[in-house]
């Protein structure tokens, strides 16, 4: 089973791109997810999780969500590889979002 559930704030506005070969829309964004444990200075730390969504979900995220919004994401963890311009193999770990829920804007949280 490969299932991820995250709640965090969008770190910047999402970016959407249409894939030329398929015509599918892909939207990428990153959310900051607070850790439950504080560091040695007593401060909260966060993990910055890259998320990719496709199709209608991608269109809705790009249209309605912005930096600072609190969102819930459910999906799966994916690791993919590619070769860079020097021929080196690179690995990318990301969440492929199947559902994204708008929870609140940054203004509502204040």
Swiss-Prot record:
One of its GO terms (biological process) is DNA replication. It holds the Pfam family SSB. It comes from Clostridium acetobutylicum (strain ATCC 824 / DSM 792 / JCM 1419 / IAM 19013 / LMG 5710 / NBRC 13948 / NRRL B-527 / VKM B-1787 / 2291 / W). The keyword Translocase does not apply. Keywords: DNA-binding. GO terms for cellular component: nucleoid. HAMAP family: SSB (MF_00984). Residues 1-104 form the SSB domain. One of its GO terms (molecular function) is single-stranded DNA binding. Homotetramer. This is Single-stranded DNA-binding protein 1. The lineage of its organism: Bacteria, Bacillati, Bacillota, Clostridia, Eubacteriales. CDD domains: SSB_OBF (cd04496). It comes from the Bacteria. The gene is ssb1.
